[in-house]
Amino acid sequence: LDSMSRYNYGNEDTQLEVGEKVSYFYSATRRAYMENLLKSLDGRSVQIQGSNPARGNLSMDFYRGYPTGKSTYLDEVLGEKFRITEPLEQPKWDIIADSTKQILNYDCQMARCTFKGRIWTAWFTADIPLDNGPWKLYGLPGLILRAYDSKQQYIFDCVGMKQAKE
């Protein structure tokens, strides 16, 4: 498979959960689908084939910092489940001076990097001092609220935030 080829995943809700030592990025669409499916099965079994937009197209889960100093990527391809654990690789960002805009009422600044074969642009806010973001994008002096690759095959937009319950 060519990860640089054009594949349209469509729009999908993803979620980034940030803890003190670990962050978790996943498809919220897929998680909601699976939770509803499990509730409806009530002990029965079912076989699912083909693509269903309601269940989400992204099957990956990504943990940064688990285990410590590493990242863990979980995915499913053609029914086979995979787990890849590797050392953390931090993108080498160039912060673009005099580039600002507002996202969700936060002042954001632009940064760029080449990472995993793509040129990425990210907008981060120093108002939320977490060096985190979607997928494997992190390492800026604030939370990434928008990121996209130069071909705009992947676009991550933060549409809301909430504080988790303790």
Feature-to-residue mapping (PLM):
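Gly/Pro-enriched, hydrophobic low-complexity segments
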Residues: 112-165
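Structural motif
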Residues: 103-104, 115
